[in-house]
């Protein structure tokens, strides 16, 4: 990757073709638990937020209400692409954003469409992102955002 490319664009280049990310949270028992989720973004903007559709009545929504700190890992061994991001998750109630991101693939899980009452749009505001640089055999930090006090 070129060093003059903005970090959010580099991140998108690394994950855009990886169908599933492993979304990891701390469950009610305090254990780390991972779920395969499909990233709904069409790009990653400077705000560095990733979006996922999840069932409103499921474990993920309950868990992030208790602990919003999550991580998402992406891997494509065929492309030597390994990415880890972490941030704060929340349910985004923006119906226009749901409409924008809803796809035929999402309809398989939420047949009533983007207005399905059980459809929750999960927004993960990234605080940290890094990837494995295969050529140099090391982790490379894409960005680290300071948390607001």
Question: Where do the model's predicted regions map?
Answer:
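A positional/architectural concept
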Residues: 30-37
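Charged, gly/pro-rich active-site loop segments
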Residues: 1-3, 85-149
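A short mixed-secondary-structure module that forms the rim of ligand-binding clefts
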Residues: 40-79
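General beta-strand recognition
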Residues: 22, 49-51, 130
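A generic structural signal for short beta-strands and their flanking turns/coil linkers
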Residues: 19, 35, 46-50, 66-70, ...
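N-terminal leader/targeting segments and the immediate start of mature chains
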Residues: 1-19
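Charged, amphipathic alpha-helical segments
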Residues: 4-8, 54-58, 106-107
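A short, Trp-centered hydrophobic/proline-enriched beta-strand micro-motif
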Residues: 13-30, 70-74
